[in-house]
């Protein structure tokens, strides 16, 4: 069973609110770099980049990060992993990085992303943007900017759908069939 928990209008308002929060928190945007975790985190990063440009008249550098080979669960996947590379590689040394992903669950994706970021330099600071925080952390990771906190059961799934990949912007909660 599927339940829409963020519709298209709420999705855009959430992107706008997070953009405002980023601008308010940083006295200057000159040293900021947006890094989106592929796939949907990268698309959300593009949305934030666009909205921040509208609000602050400045376009932040953007990098899409593939964390495939940094994951700690590669041995569980029986398919050969496909690395899609990094788009617009940026040296993040001395930069304030805003790391962006769609859903925060166990924290393992973010840990992998932090490991991957080290290959691009030593950032001054890394902040985390998450569209949906669903809880159930296995690692001590906390987001600096959260679109929406959605308490879930471990058996449920939170699926972020974006225009590029899914033809719409929304977030749905998918319950297991036996619940």
From Swiss-Prot:
Q: What is its EC number?
A: 2.4.2.9
- What Gene3D superfamilies is this protein classified in? 3.40.50.2020
Biological process according to GO: regulation of DNA-templated transcription
- Classify the source by domain of life: Bacteria
Q: What are the protein's GO molecular function terms?
A: uracil phosphoribosyltransferase activity
Catalysed reaction per UniProt? UMP + diphosphate = 5-phospho-alpha-D-ribose 1-diphosphate + uracil
- Enzyme class, UniProt record, top EC level: transferase
The UniProt entry, under SUPFAM superfamilies, shows: PRTase-like
Question: Per the Swiss-Prot or TrEMBL record, what residue ranges does the short sequence motif PRPP-binding cover?
Answer: 97-109
Q: Which UniProt keywords apply?
A: Glycosyltransferase, Transcription, Transcription regulation, Transferase
Q: What Pfam families does the entry give?
A: Pribosyltran
Its transmembrane ranges are none
Q: Which family does it belong to?
A: Belongs to the purine/pyrimidine phosphoribosyltransferase family. PyrR subfamily.
Its function?
Regulates the transcription of the pyrimidine nucleotide (pyr) operon in response to exogenous pyrimidines. Also displays a weak uracil phosphoribosyltransferase activity which is not physiologically significant.
Q: What is the name of this protein?
A: Bifunctional protein PyrR
Give the source species: Actinobacillus pleuropneumoniae serotype 5b (strain L20)
Q: What is the lineage of its organism?
A: Bacteria, Pseudomonadati, Pseudomonadota, Gammaproteobacteria, Pasteurellales
What's the encoding gene here?
A: pyrR
């Amino acid at each position: 069973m599927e339940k829409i928990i963020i519709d298209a209008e709420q999705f855009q308002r959430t992107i706008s609110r997070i953009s405002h929060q980023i601008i308010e928190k940083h006295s200057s945007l000159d040293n900021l770099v947006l890094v989106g975790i592929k796939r949907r985190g990268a698309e959300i990063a593009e949305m934030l980049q666009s909205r921040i440009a509208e609000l602050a008249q400045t376009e932040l550098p953007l990098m899409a990060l593939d964390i495939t080979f940094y994951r700690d669960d590669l041995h569980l996947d029986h398919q050969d992993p496909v690395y899609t590379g990094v788009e617009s590689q940026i040296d993040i040394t001395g930069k304030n990085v805003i790391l962006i992903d769609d859903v925060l669950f166990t924290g393992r994706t973010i840990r992998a992303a932090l490991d991957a970021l080290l290959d691009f330099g030593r950032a001054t600071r890394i902040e985390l943007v998450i569209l949906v925080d669903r809880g159930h952390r296995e690692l001590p990771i906390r987001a600096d900017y959260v679109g929406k906190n959605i308490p879930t059961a471990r058996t449920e799934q939170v699926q972020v759908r974006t225009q590029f990949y899914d033809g719409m912007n929304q977030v749905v909660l998918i319950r297991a069939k036996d619940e």
